[in-house]
């Protein structure tokens, strides 16, 4: 079981990396809103097919009203607002630096979980947050040293803000997802989020 989880985690990391590269190129060609719309539409189609094959139910008709509420809010925040911030950051500072900022999302999620869900923050989690934050600061400062011109630095600053906002948005979305999905099917739960994003 641990091996399956490790393979899944590795596969997720690979997919995240590839998708970031594709999204960066897409935003430069058709814009942020275009990429975001096509992303959620394709996601809905694939999720519907997956749910139909695995559960025999292409639409999440068995979800409770509470599940619909939490996951719909999560979808709008995560797949609309957050991804608009993220894709704008891709377009401004590139996928490499933007993805680096996403590394602080688990830290924001842990803090929000502590505040709203009363989850416990272990000391090693606090140390990890500090290390990640330090790494991001070093990367940003290194990039600033090789940049020349006020306009370029202002564009970078704007990109950093959008990347940070996307990280925070992802964390807020995750808190709503935790509350909504609980024991519900993960694929169908994600489909609710995607459906709300298409409407939103």
Predicted regions and their residues:
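Alpha-helical transmembrane segments of compact multi-pass small-molecule transporters, enriched
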Residues: 41-47, 101-115, 130, 195-200
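Membrane-helix interface residues
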Residues: 30, 93, 119-121, 184-185
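Glycine-/small-residue-enriched transmembrane alpha-helix faces in small-molecule transporters
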Residues: 1-34, 45, 150-195, 199
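Hydrophobic core positions of alpha-helical segments in small-molecule transporters
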Residues: 11, 38-39, 101-104, 123-127, ...
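C-terminal ends of transmembrane helices
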Residues: 18-33, 80-96, 138-151, 200
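Hydrophobic/aromatic residues within transmembrane alpha-helices
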Residues: 26, 35, 39, 89, ...
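Loop-to-transmembrane-helix transition segments
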Residues: 4-12, 51, 58-81, 85, ...
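Loop-to-transmembrane alpha-helix entry segments
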Residues: 59-65, 102, 109, 113-138, ...
């Amino acid at each position: 079981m641990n091996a399956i989880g490790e393979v899944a985690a590795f596969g997720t990391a690979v997919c995240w990396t590839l998708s970031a590269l594709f999204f960066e190129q897409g935003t430069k060609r058709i814009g942020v809103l275009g990429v975001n719309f096509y992303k959620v539409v394709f996601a809905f189609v694939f999720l519907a097919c997956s749910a139909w094959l695995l559960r025999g139910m292409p639409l999440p008709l068995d979800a409770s009203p509470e599940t619909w509420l939490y996951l719909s809010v999560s979808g709008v925040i995560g797949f609309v607002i957050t991804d608009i911030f993220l894709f704008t950051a891709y377009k401004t500072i590139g996928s490499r630096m933007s993805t680096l900022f996403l590394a602080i999302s688990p830290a924001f999620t842990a803090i929000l979980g502590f505040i709203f869900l009363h989850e416990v923050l272990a000391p090693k989690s606090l140390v990890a947050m500090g290390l990640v934050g330090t790494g991001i600061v070093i990367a940003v400062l290194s990039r600033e040293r090789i940049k020349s011109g006020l306009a370029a630095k202002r564009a970078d600053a704007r990109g950093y803000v959008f990347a940070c906002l996307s990280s925070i948005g992802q964390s807020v979305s995750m808190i709503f997802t935790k509350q909504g999905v609980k024991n519900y099917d993960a694929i169908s739960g994600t489909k609710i989020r995607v459906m709300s994003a298409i409407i939103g």
